[in-house]
Amino acid sequence: ANGTNVFLVTSDSTGTPKPKDTVKVTDGKFEFEGKTEMPEIAYVAFEKTPNGNVGFILENGTVTINFDSKNLEKNKISGTKNNDLYQSYNNANLDIQKKVKAIYEANGAFMQKNPETEEEKVKAQGIMDEFQKIQLEMDKRSKDFVAKNQNTFVALLLVENLFYTNKMEASKAKEFYDSLDNDLKETTSGKSVKKHLEMQLPLEKAKA
């Protein structure tokens, strides 16, 4: 709605959200202007709006964000190479987002409480198993996406997440990192992967 504050949010070196700029919605639109040294993951947050966050890649160029608070599937990011790629990744995983949403809608109240009876414990375990299956499918899709989109910032973000959550071996992450252009290695995510590699590679070699 017009007059709504829109916040541009990035993260500091510890991953803590950091508001970077604020504008107001005017005539149903908002605009941020500025320059950035390198691409980074960011999001715009709409004040007092349920599900009012939209993730995108902050980089130089014109990025267009279409936001629909009533139908999140209509949210769209476009305009730069990385954001087009990010949107294609999101589009490919809409079915998974729908599955997660359906589980929450069907079991929201139940998931708020501690299971007490045997029947409740079985149901809770079933929900956990369902989430685990979805997570495994998501991890597989992320790895497939990385394999098809080597040397891109979006793939780097996915590798960073997979590597930090122990879903990717250090040797595989190193293979990916070594093939990156220097400008990608210099991003916050590139430095983060390098730092984690320095810790994890010796541990992996020691186990071998």
PLM features per residue range, with description:
Residues 1-140:
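A non-transmembrane, solvent-exposed segment enriched in polar/low-complexity residues
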Residues 172-208:
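N-proximal helix/coil linker or "cap" segments that precede and/or mark the start of modular domains
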Residues 151-162:
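Amphipathic alpha-helical repeat scaffolds of TPR domains
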Residues 111-114, 146, 163, 180-185:
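A conserved position within tetratricopeptide repeats
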Residues 131-149, 168-172:
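Amphipathic alpha-helical coiled-coil segments
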Residues 149-153, 185-188:
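Short coil turns that delineate tetratricopeptide repeat
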